[in-house]
Amino acid sequence: GRKDKGVFFGKKAGEVFRKKIEELGIQAIIPVPVHPNRRRERGYNQAEVIGESLAKVCGIPLVSEYLQRVKKTKALKDCSPEERLLNLLEAIHCEALPSDVKRVLLVDDIFTTGATMEACSRKLLEAGAEEVHILSIAGRVER
């Protein structure tokens, strides 16, 4: 994934969904985290790049420090849906959210099985969010 594509898609998502995001009362945009090693290899987190552009268009803060990938997971494509979720629940940590942040928008680049969004959403709810809405730029198509 190229960084400029993330900027483009984040901006487009903001233009398309800004009104809905306002209606939902979203208080923070939170990108799905990548493991620090992956970030170093790539130089950036694509979900964070998308989230930054989206946040700019919507005038909502991007908050990337609370949700963290603390453990590297094995290749999830080889796992069953249950294994994926369990691996991700162990790999993701969320700091307690500020008390005034109750409605968040979780952003990722690709929605495959939903396990990543599910694990991150659970962690955000445990950390104090009352509502977690999700936005993904692309999804997997079954053949």
Q: Where are the predicted features?
A:
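Conserved PRPP/pyrophosphate-binding segment of the phosphoribosyltransferase/PRPP-pathway fold
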Residues: 1-105, 115-143
